[in-house]
Amino acid sequence: MEQILAVLGAFTYKQLIMMLVGAGLIWLAIEKEYEPNLLLPMGFGTILVNIPLSSAISQMVDGTLHKGALSVLFDLGIATELFPLLIFIAVGAMIDFSPLLSNPVMFLFGFAAQAGIFLTMGLALLFGFSLHEAASIGIIGAADGPTSIYVSARFAPHLLGPISVAAYTYMAIVPLIQPPVIRLLTTKSERRIKMAYAKRAVSRRTKILFPIAVTLVAGVVAPASVSLIGFLMFGNLVRECGVLERLSKAAQNELANLVTLLLGFTIAATMTGERFVQTSTLLIIAMGLVAFILDTAAGVLAAKVLNLFRSEKINPMVGAAGISAFPMSARVIQRMGQQEDPSNFLLMHAVGANVAGQIGSVLAGGLLLAYLG
């Protein structure tokens, strides 16, 4: 009875708020199906770490440090960057770069749509965040959860909780974020532009050489990005080599599912009331939304600028698919195109831009690590 009273008496309002946050994440995962693989374990973990005297996280008791399970997992999987890198292998194994390789102009949108990262980074500096904290906040605009986790774990581990929540929540609601921005920046006639798609065969040799070439180029431009881009491209090489089919399927399914579960559960170790319930958390979440909006706008505007020099016009909506939220963003563009003109089929173009965004986001993260690390 004394133990129960001690626990109840140790509750703080911040811990109660975080328990509500945890319950909210679980609700979003189950009821709305927003990134359930990550938000469900993150939400449950948040409840665990905010129980007073919880053995889930490391605690000082009578002058002795008692290590908690989630804290140990955090040190092994996040602090060492192991979990995000394993996720990159899984993501690489899932991606088919054929739509991009058959239409290389889409590379431009994969890079242009990363502008929100650097613009938001500047905004964070204006709000008084340090350079490393600003970079960690800006990388939310990568629309790539593992990249956001990797960079923030390196630069600002104390902000990992709100950055992860913002990144994955906004990725899940891309269908709500992008359409208003796209409509604001385009005319109806622009949204109805049709793009012919002539499927060009991409040889097996090209598919095998592509991940190797990207890794070499990234390594020369930004050596600090090699672990990020290298693990992503290794996963893709496993997919495309044709002799590791069982490993490819295992990476896409078992590896992705298990590591995502551990990643979400482990991130919760940073989501204690003392760390999370601060004014800076609201600022980070708000700036994350700004980053997604700026990414979308940059992609659309890049397409409009490119159209000034092309006789065969690009539908500006395709530029918005250059963010890394794959395949949600490509689906958004396809749906918007069909709403404007049911005969308009933009999916393959949007997928090309979307997978280019996967490369662009990882390279952007690598550049931040290279020049700020």
Placement of each model-derived feature along the sequence:
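N-terminal alpha-helical transmembrane segments of multi-pass membrane transport
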Residues: 1-65
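Hydrophobic transmembrane alpha-helices of secondary-active transporters
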Residues: 25, 48, 77-101, 235-238, ...
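Alpha-helical membrane segments and immediately flanking helix-loop junctions
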Residues: 75-80, 91-94, 109-119, 123, ...
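Entry/N-cap segments of selected transmembrane alpha helices
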Residues: 97-121, 272-299, 350-354
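Juxtamembrane and boundary regions of transmembrane helices in multi-pass small-molecule transporters
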Residues: 122-131, 163-191, 298-311, 356-373
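Alpha-helical transmembrane segments
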Residues: 159-176, 285-294, 318
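Membrane-embedded hairpin module used as a gating/binding unit in multi-pass transport
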Residues: 169-243
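Transmembrane helical segments that form the transport core of multi-pass membrane transport proteins
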Residues: 214-299
